[in-house]
Amino acid sequence: MSERMQYIRNFCIIAHIDHGKSTLADRLIEKTGFLSERETDKQILDNLELERERGITIKLKPVRMIYKAKDGNEYELNLIDTPGHVDFTYEVSRSIAACEGALLVVDATQGIEAQTLANVYMALEHDLEIVPVINKIDLPSANPEHVKKEIEDVIGIDAEDALLTSAKEGIGIEEVLEAIVNRIPPPKGDENKPLKALIFDSFYDNYKGAISFVRVVDGIVKPGMRIKMFSTGKVFEVTEVGMFRPNLYPVEELKSGEVGYIAASIKNVKDTRVGDTITDADNPADSPLPGYKEVVPMVFCGIYPADGQDYENLKEALEKLQLNDASLVFEPDTSAALGFGFRCGFLGLLHMEIVQERLEREYNLNLVTTAPSVIYKVYKTNGEVLDLDNPTKMPPPTQIDHIEEPIVEATIMVPTEYVGAIMELCQDRRGVYLGMEYLEQTRVLLKYEMPLNEIIYDFFDALKSRTRGYASFDYELKGYKESNLVKLDILINGELVDALSMIVHKDKAYEKARKIVEKLKENIPRHLFEIPIQAAIGSKIIARETVKALRKNVLAKCYGGDVTRKKKLLEKQKEGKKRMRQVGSVEIPQEAFMSILKLDDEK
């Protein structure tokens, strides 16, 4: 191993939402002198306005610090940030693969959460050295001894010499830097071998094209070289390489063990896939680095402009977002009810919400979104298999042999007093109980096998509301299972509204249909004629509500008078309403669509 590499440390920070990851990162950067005090009020690594607002890290932003350690040497520390949310598990696994060690940051007042667990196990699989850091010790309710014991019991790593810090107050930061130098091993690699570099993120720059964030494993990369991507075989010429001092800082070359960026006038982020290996086109390595997989969208929904004229703007906005987010997929789609729009695929629910919010915020668009759906496998009687991501494309029941739906294994951590409520919730959502273990007297880890379909609506919200926000939840896809599913159609005034169709489990169809028609009745304004709202499976109507007509009092001018006279006027009014109903069209407001997405919250 070269002399140079002994002074490099690559590490990431693993923490649950709100345990103080971004603040700790800020303090480390400040301590190594890369930021003036003036810049430290904001969370440097969280670029998107949305990230700061929600307090979550979505886009990773690496940073390089130089630290003069107590042994008198200068060390190069590369911090690779990781998003802490379940939707971005693959991204996390790639940034973990780029490191040799991890700081496990746990809130001294809260202890370990389910998502932290998932990421720590992933770090252990990649043989990372884990340094436990117990943060927020300045708070009165902090209980570091208890948290140490929990880290040992739950994760099984020694927490005797866990570091006690308060990122907010700047306590213990020096100790963290020393621990990074002394406890995390230097990178392995050989700069004389052919180039191998792992892409762990990328973003789009208007002038330089798609820029890949890489960890160089073997070899050297410098401007003018021709590089090749393993997964696509495409070749590009490197125009610039550099480091991050939070901002891009060009250097002459990147050598093995270092973390930096490569710009090669790549037009599309799709060509710089996360987890892919870059090698020298003229002297390629034999095999790529392990662990690359294509990112597959799990959740789909239709996004339509509320105003039809915004279609082009929506298309442009999605294309711009896609430049920075290769996991977002979309294709044009039309709906009889909503006009032209797009069918979009996302990694998960949070990803979907973030994309929608960014479209509305950054591009000032007014959007209508349909209920989210997952990919079903439909086995037809003629032997064909369909991947169905849109309920409207479901073939007629006579052609279907059976349908399979995606199943996930969910890990839920809850305080003991809420176990009953959560088990009930999971059973409601067709969960199959796999087991439970007590982490300590007060907390339980539950494992359930559940259909993804049941999680994507509002499972997370229901979980939080039943446990007063104390539960944490993580899931991974397990595969497909046969299930008794049907397509539920909604008819308004006798016409099918395709945007409201959804796929549901047969046992729950009636209950769901009842709720939907009641909800729609509340949200569709009254017209001059009555509007039937029906829910149907195939040709069978299973639920109905009627929005009453607005009517004029035609009897106002008959004082006393003959009953037949009144009847005649009422009959005449009825005739008119009937005629009107045949030609009238019903306006369905955006609130009606939104109310259906929020159905189960109100129990």
Swiss-Prot record:
Entry's Gene Ontology molecular function annotations: GTP binding; GTPase activity; ribosome binding; translation elongation factor activity
**Reaction equation(s) it catalyzes:** GTP + H2O = GDP + phosphate + H(+)
According to its UniProt entry, the protein's GO biological process terms are:
positive regulation of translation
What is the main EC category here? hydrolase
Localization, per the record, is: Cell membrane
Q: Which GO terms describe its cellular component?
A: plasma membrane
Q: Which residues form the tr-type G domain?
A: 6-188
Where is GTP bound in this sequence? D18, H19, G20, K21, S22, T23, N135, K136, I137, D138
- How does the record say this protein sits in the membrane? Peripheral membrane protein
Family matches, as InterPro entries: EF-4, EFG_II, EFG_III/V, EFG_V-like, EFTu-like_2, G_TR_CS, LepA_C_sf, LepA_CTD
Question: What Enzyme Commission number(s) appear in the record?
Answer: 3.6.5.n1
SUPFAM superfamilies in UniProt: EF-G C-terminal domain-like (SSF54980), P-loop containing nucleoside triphosphate hydrolases (SSF52540), Translation proteins (SSF50447)
* Gene3D superfamilies in the cross-refs: 3.30.70.240, Elongation factor 4, C-terminal domain (3.30.70.2570), Elongation Factor G (Translational Gtpase), domain 3 (3.30.70.870), P-loop containing nucleotide triphosphate hydrolases (3.40.50.300), Translation factors (2.40.30.10)
Cross-referenced Pfam families: EFG_C, EFG_III, GTP_EFTU, GTP_EFTU_D2, LepA_C
Keywords of the record: Cell membrane, GTP-binding, Hydrolase, Membrane, Nucleotide-binding, Protein biosynthesis
**In which family does this protein belong, per the annotation?**
Belongs to the TRAFAC class translation factor GTPase superfamily. Classic translation factor GTPase family. LepA subfamily.
Q: What does this protein do?
A: Required for accurate and efficient protein synthesis under certain stress conditions. May act as a fidelity factor of the translation reaction, by catalyzing a one-codon backward translocation of tRNAs on improperly translocated ribosomes. Back-translocation proceeds from a post-translocation (POST) complex to a pre-translocation (PRE) complex, thus giving elongation factor G a second chance to translocate the tRNAs correctly. Binds to ribosomes in a GTP-dependent manner.
Can you name this protein?
A: Elongation factor 4
Source organism of the structure: Thermoanaerobacter pseudethanolicus (strain ATCC 33223 / 39E)
Q: What is the lineage of its organism?
A: Bacteria, Bacillati, Bacillota, Clostridia, Thermoanaerobacterales
